[in-house]
């Protein structure tokens, strides 16, 4: 695995890990029933794209109509915080070690790569969800869909 996320606890680092995890996770409909990542990633991407303009619109609308500035600022800050919450969740998830059932599945997929004659870098540390995302992305590109049968 190329990028094993460090277990840094800084919130900015979690946001960066979340962005990296969002880019790495394969958005495949077969994974949707088992992992919440598909829904979180779609909602976060939506928030990144539409919440800042919504916040600006809310501020201008409240100010133009002579409304109070306090509630307008609070609404704008809330709208801007939604995509940040998604990135933070994804960053936290990326650095979380895999539970036993997923760890077994992780190694089974690696074994299927070995059986297909595809070399993989050895696992350096305890696999995390980021490691699983990288493995799944590669598996969807290089293996047939039979690796999903074991879920």
From Swiss-Prot:
Pfam families: DUF412
Compartments reported by the entry: Cell inner membrane
Membrane topology term: Multi-pass membrane protein
GO annotations of cellular component type: plasma membrane
Sections of the chain in a coiled coil: none
Key word Manganese present: no
Transmembrane portions of the chain: 46-65, 69-91
Keyword set, alphabetical order: Cell inner membrane, Cell membrane, Membrane, Transmembrane, Transmembrane helix
Keyword Transmembrane: yes
Protein family: Belongs to the UPF0208 family.
Name of the molecule in the record: UPF0208 membrane protein plu3094
Organism of provenance: Photorhabdus laumondii subsp. laumondii (strain DSM 15139 / CIP 105565 / TT01) (Photorhabdus luminescens subsp. laumondii)
């Amino acid at each position: 695995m190329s990028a094993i996320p460090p277990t840094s606890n800084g919130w900015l680092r979690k946001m960066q890990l979340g962005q990296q995890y969002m880019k790495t996770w394969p958005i495949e409909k077969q994974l949707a029933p088992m992992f919440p990542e598909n829904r979180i990633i779609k909602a976060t991407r939506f928030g990144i794209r539409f919440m800042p303009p919504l916040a600006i619109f809310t501020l201008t609308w409240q100010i133009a109509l002579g409304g109070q500035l306090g509630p307008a600022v609070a609404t704008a800050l809330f709208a801007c915080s939604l995509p940040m919450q998604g990135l933070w969740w994804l960053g936290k998830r990326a650095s979380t070690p895999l539970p036993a059932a997923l760890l077994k599945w992780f190694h089974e997929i690696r074994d299927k790569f070995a059986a297909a004659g595809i070399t993989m870098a050895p696992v350096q540390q305890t696999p995390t969800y980021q490691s699983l995302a990288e493995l799944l992305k590669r598996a969807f590109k290089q293996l047939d869909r039979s690796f999903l049968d074991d879920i």
